[in-house]
């Protein structure tokens, strides 16, 4: 700060100008290095935002608004200083009603006091941000003084800093209107059936919520039930209603992908400010947000921060930070040892926070070709849950097994040519060597000469929609919560078939995989083995349900491949079933009078289920009514369902 002290030693900079160092922006954990407030020559309120950097050099990147520079831990990508300063000013303008109402002018810039001017920071690719927030360099102390004096002529006699810190928080109409216009007509975010029920229920709870009447909605749903579709619609609608809301997720990938899809004409920072990680609420004042929409809530942790040493409980902290919280959760997608956010724990925590709680379930299946049967078959085959879905038909879902990983890759690449919505993914059984050595490959299967790199840092969290990322292989962290048309899955040696059992082997995971690190600490061997089995099987269940139209698989363990093949319906079996004559069924009435329901008639459901236990996400809908005879007294709990087997 000594550099700024020297800058401010100018008689024409008013001594009573407002100064703030390390100012924390409301709604965020972001801090502005240096702020100067005052009035310009016509008595208008002014705020100069200065981003300070100690850098002495930087490198270009091919990513928007990013440069590379050296930190203590080495060279890494970071935001361009002008982008940072501009983004802070934009965030305040977008969400501070007082700043907008009183027309307080925010003027950002950057000061790199150790940096000799070159063609990197001022490169034309950064021009949009340099125009908004000019950078000043080692030799520009005089220019920075003139810049400050241009905007701050008189001292701060109007408590401008107080208005920024304590002003009314409300998203701007421009931000809301732009967001709504981007969602309109976007087929990807149209809600159907029970998605609409959850959406309207959530809005009703949001309207009821207040600081002393917290509302918590817990929405359970399996893969492809549209949890994220509802979440994004709620984010847009609450912003349209000028409520302070945010989409929250533990993983960066869903945030980055949905933000990119919604960006449209908005500048990147404006849309990204509406998305945040789950580890930023441990010091957020109570009820700062009107609404927090938590997607993939099963991934929430206890501790936050890079070293997991901040905060106490992300579920409790999120509930405390908002008047209303909507949690979207799938209890079968816990894939990390530190994941705590199952529905039971969320409900228990919400009760301890004295919140009003409602629970709903999304059941309609939009992924996996709309087949609940595929999910139930998968649970049965992975031996997660016993269901009656022993065999899988190609009519249910396009599931194929490949004996050669190269053929699998070629098939996925061919599928991807249509719309860039097919990718290869794998279990984390291979070290990420290419992170340090760009020439190295990661996922290697020597018997077939197969070699691919894990998803590179180039696309980062948006790997799944990257233009050229088809040539890289993704892992659970870059695809969970997102969907593809076709998923090519490589199942590593951490999942095997032995003695009639699908077994897991945590020792086959990469040593770089943090999801199972420390699994033996504080647990008996049996407890550790049980948890490892749950995490590994949940990981593959998640990978195997990313494809909406098809899933193609290669197994490193050949006994496991043979076992999976045995669970597929053979073509001759299918032909045998199809050749049977259609039985004459009873007459189905579309509707009957209420006075004969459950007296003479029982409801018929559409689900053609195997006899036995149904999968958790298998749902039935009423198709009509059938008259019954010889069954004795009927009750309202009875129904008719067509069964195969």
List each model region and its residues:
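Conserved helicase/translocase motor-coupling segment
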Residues: 231, 336-341, 355-374, 383-501
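N-terminal pre-P-loop "Q-motif" helix
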Residues: 172, 187-215
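C-terminal accessory regions
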Residues: 326, 472-476, 480-574
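Conserved RecA-like ASCE ATPase "motif II neighborhood" in helicase/translocase motors
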Residues: 264-320, 471-474
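Conserved lysine of the Walker
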Residues: 227-228
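Accessory nucleic-acid engagement/destabilization modules that flank
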Residues: 1-163
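Signature of the SF2 helicase/ATPase Hel1-core->accessory helical subdomain module
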Residues: 293-362, 499
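Short, positionally conserved secondary-structure boundary motifs
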Residues: 576-644
């Amino acid at each position: 700060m000594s550099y700024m002290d020297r800058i401010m030693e100018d008689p024409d900079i008013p001594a009573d100008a407002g100064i703030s160092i390390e100012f924390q922006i409301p709604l965020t954990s972001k801090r502005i290095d240096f702020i100067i407030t005052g009035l310009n020559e016509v008595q208008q309120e002014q705020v100069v935002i200065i981003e300070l950097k100690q850098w002495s050099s930087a490198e270009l990147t091919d990513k928007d608004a990013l440069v590379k520079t050296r930190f203590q831990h080495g060279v890494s990508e970071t935001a361009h200083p002008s982008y940072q300063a501009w983004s802070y000013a934009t965030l305040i303008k977008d969400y501070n009603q007082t700043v907008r109402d009183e027309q307080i002018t925010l003027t950002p810039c950057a000061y790199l006091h150790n940096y000799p001017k070159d063609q990197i920071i001022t490169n034309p690719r950064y021009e949009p941000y340099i125009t908004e927030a000019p950078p000043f360099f080692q030799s520009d102390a005089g220019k920075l003084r003139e810049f400050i004096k241009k905007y701050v002529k008189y001292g701060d006699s109007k408590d401008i800093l107080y208005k920024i810190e304590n002003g009314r928080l409300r998203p701007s109409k421009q931000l809301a209107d732009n967001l709504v216009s981007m969602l309109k007509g976007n087929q990807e975010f149209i809600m159907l059936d029970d998605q609409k029920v959850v959406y309207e229920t959530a809005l009703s709870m949001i309207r009821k919520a207040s600081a002393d009447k917290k509302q918590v909605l817990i929405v359970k749903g399996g893969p492809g039930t549209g949890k994220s579709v509802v979440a994004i619609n709620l984010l847009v609608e609450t912003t349209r209603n000028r409520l302070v809301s945010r989409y929250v997720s533990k993983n960066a990938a869903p945030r980055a992908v949905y933000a990119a899809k919604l960006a449209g004409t908005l500048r990147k920072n404006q849309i990204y400010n509406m998305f945040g990680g789950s580890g930023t609420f441990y010091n957020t004042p109570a009820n700062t947000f009107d609404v927090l929409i938590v997607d993939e809530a099963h991934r929430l942790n206890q501790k936050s921060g890079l070293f997991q040493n901040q905060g106490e409980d992300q579920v409790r902290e999120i509930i405390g930070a908002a008047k209303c919280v909507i949690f979207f959760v799938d209890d079968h997608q816990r894939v990390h040892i530190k994941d705590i956010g199952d529905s039971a724990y969320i409900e228990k925590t919400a009760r301890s926070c004295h919140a009003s709680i409602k629970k709903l379930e999304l059941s309609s299946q939009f992924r996996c070709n709309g087949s609940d049967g595929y999910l139930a078959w998968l649970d049965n085959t992975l031996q997660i849950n016993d269901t009656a879905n022993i065999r899988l038909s190609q009519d249910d879902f396009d599931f194929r097994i490949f004996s050669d990983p190269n053929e699998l890759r070629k098939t996925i690449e061919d599928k991807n040519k249509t719309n860039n919505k097919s990718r290869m993914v794998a279990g984390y059984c291979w070290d990420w060597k290419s992170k340090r050595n760009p020439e190295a490959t990661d996922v290697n299967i020597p018997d077939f000469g197969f070699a691919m790199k894990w998803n590179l840092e180039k696309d980062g969290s948006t790997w799944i929609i990257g233009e050229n990322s088809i040539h890289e292989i993704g892992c659970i962290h870059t695809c969970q919560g997102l969907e593809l048309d076709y998923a090519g899955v490589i199942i590593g040696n951490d999942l095997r078939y032995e003695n009639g059992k699908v077994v897991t082997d945590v020792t086959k995971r990469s040593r770089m995989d943090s999801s199972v690190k420390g699994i033996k600490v504080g647990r008996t061997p049996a407890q550790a083995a049980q948890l490892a089995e749950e995490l590994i099987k949940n990981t593959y269940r998640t990978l195997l349900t990313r494809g909406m139209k098809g899933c193609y698989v290669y197994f490193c363990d050949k006994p496991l491949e043979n076992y999976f093949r045995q669970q597929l319906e053979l073509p001759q079996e299918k032909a045998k079933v199809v050749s049977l004559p259609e039985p004459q069924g009873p007459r189905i009435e579309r509707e009957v009078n209420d006075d004969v329901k459950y007296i003479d008639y029982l409801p018929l459901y559409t689900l053609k289920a195997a006899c036995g236990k149904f999968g958790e996400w298998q749902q039935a809908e009423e198709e009509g009514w059938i008259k019954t005879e010889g069954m004795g007294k009927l009750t309202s709990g009875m129904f008719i369902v067509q069964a195969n087997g």
